[in-house]
Structures are given as C-alpha cells and as structure tokens.
Amino acid sequence: MLPASAYTRRGATIAGQELTGLLDARKVLDLFRDGATVVLQGLHRYWPPLTRLVADLELELGHPCQANAYLTPPGNQGFAVHSDSHDVFVFQTAGSKLWEVHGPDGAEEVLLEPGVSMYLPTGTPHAARAQDTVSLHVTIGVNQLTWRGLVRRSLEPLLAEVSDDHLPAGHLDDPSRLREGLAARLEELADRVRGLDAAEAVERETTRFLTTRPARLSGGLLGALAEDRLADDTVLRRRPGPCVLREDGDRLRVLLGDRVLTVPGRLRPALERVRGADELTPADLDLDPQSRLVLCRRLVREGLLSPVDR
C-alpha cells in the first residue's frame, strides 16, 4: 500500500485554504507504468450501474455493501496474501487474474477471466496476479451485520440508564462494597432485559438500516428546477433504493434509505403504486389532482422520483 503522498499533490488553494488529498494524475500514471494497481475505492458512489447493483443487493441481503475496482498492469500483483473482515464477491471484467486462495486444505490457484466470479468468505487469505494483459476486476464487499451487534444495540438504551456514580472508595480492600452493588444492578438489568420487546428492537434495527443508506441525489438539481412544472402527464422515474412502508397509527412512515417521510395513512395505495413502478405519471395515482401533484413533488424532493427529460 503506497502512502497518499505518492499519488496526491499539494499546493492548490481555494479562498486561501489549502486543499489536501487531490489526486495527481501524472503520478498515478507513472505508478501504474511501474506496476502499481489503481484502486477505485467506493466506485458505487460514482458509477450508476454499480450504484443500482449495490442498492438492490443491500435490500436483498439486509447488510451494507460496497464496490471497489482494481486495475492491475500485466504480470503484476496488487496486494500480498491478505484476508478481509467482510465477505467478498469478485467479478472479473477485463483481462485475467490468477488467484491464490487459501483454505483448510492449503492454497489453491483459481484463474478468473471476464464473466467469471468468485466468492471469498470473511477471513479467507488470498492474493491475485494479472496475467499477460491489463486486468480489471470489481469486488462487492458485504459488511455483515451480526447477532452480537444487534444484541448490543438492543441493550444500549438499558445500559445508558445504569447509574454512572463512582465506585466506592476502599473496594480494593473490601470487595463486598462492589459485590453487593454490582449484584443489585445486574439483577435490575436482567429484569429489564427480560422485559424487552423483541419486535420493537427489530423494528428499530430495520429503521436504522433503512435510514442510513447513501442519499440518492443524482439529478437532484434538475428535479428541484422541475418541481414547480410538474403536471399530471409528467413522466417520473423511480430511483433505485429503499421504499419501505410502515404503518404508525393513522400515519404511514416511508423509509427512503437516508430518511423517513411521514404521510397520512390514506396515501398507502398511491405509494404502493409508486414503489412498484419503473415509470409513472401523477395521473396514474388514484388521488384527486391536487393531492397527487403535491405527493409527486414531495417524492421528487425526497429523491424517490425524478422527472424524465423527453
């Protein structure tokens, strides 16, 4: 792994403030010629096909995902044998790479060519070397949520209510000063843990996941300019990503990935229609003209819909 100074530059300023971390394209090209692998970290944030793939995969799996790409010169190796703390799907897209994969029975060589993929479970030692031509592969990393994490997040509100008073002085000489107090607090905590509602904890976990995904703002400026011009026949496209509906009394909570939208419960049929469509117009919604335009403008503003320029 090269230090950032090897491929970035300094000296650029804006309003007198120095900018840091700026890529130096000439340095990158020179390093690539010398055998370095170019890593496009978090490519799903910038390339729409991967944005859609990662968004769909996160909804299917219920785990955060990310995508990176690795461009390696012919005959070179990007990293020494290493393992990752998350599951990895490898997709070879150009050239070929010979992978060294270590398992319980030792190392195995696997040749990946365009169109071939491979799954590497968490902790699998591996390395890869480009063959006779430049190699490009994409990895999808699955950052698994765990039972331990879920239990910890479920208990955090209870632990936050435990008194933060100081431990009594002299407890090193008289451990009973701690023993009795700890036993009482553990017993109280155990009673409260037994009273936890698992359904409520799961709902909080689902809401947390579906409100902490990356915002869908590509084309958002055009959408903002078009909001006031929306008409019944305006074609709107459903953006990729979450749209999960949760009833909350007579209201409806719409989990949109990076936020929660709360609307009257009567809008559920219209939102079901929006959720299941690739494209639609406000006139397609079974609402009065004013209500459907208000709803569609709001959904454009929230990033669920975007006007189609035709």
Question: How would you name each of these model-derived features?
Answer:
Residues 1-116, 124-164:
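Active-site region of the double-stranded beta-helix
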Residues 195-274, 297, 308-310:
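Acidic, low-complexity/disordered tracts enriched in E/D and polar residues
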Residues 119-121, 308:
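Residue-level recognition of conserved beta-strand edge/terminus positions
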Residues 2-61, 171-231:
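A short, N-terminal "cap"/entry segment at the start of jelly-roll beta-barrel domains
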Residues 286-301:
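Short amphipathic alpha-helical interaction segments
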Residues 266, 270-288:
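Short acidic, hydrophobic short linear motifs in intrinsically disordered regions
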